[in-house]
């Protein structure tokens, strides 16, 4: 899935943890990596999402943020003015008020299939 996505769009890894995409062997797929530990703000703070958009070289309104945490990822991205894909592997209901994410998928493969279709 990462190979499909990285071939088409600049991917930015955005993490509240200290994981390094290069250390885990995924760095080649990412245009940039932003860690809350390094920048001093964490999801769902809109500032970390703004840094991700800046790293990708696009306005927040043109970003499609994909994440598996409904509150930190999906709600955070939407509050930052981005489109959100909620990676909902558990199939739970959206309970975070307001608008729901642009798209909800059960897997990255499902996301890639949807993007490929159009």
What are these regions, as identified by a protein language model?
Residues 3-118:
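Asp-based, Mg2+/Mn2+-dependent phosphohydrolase catalytic module
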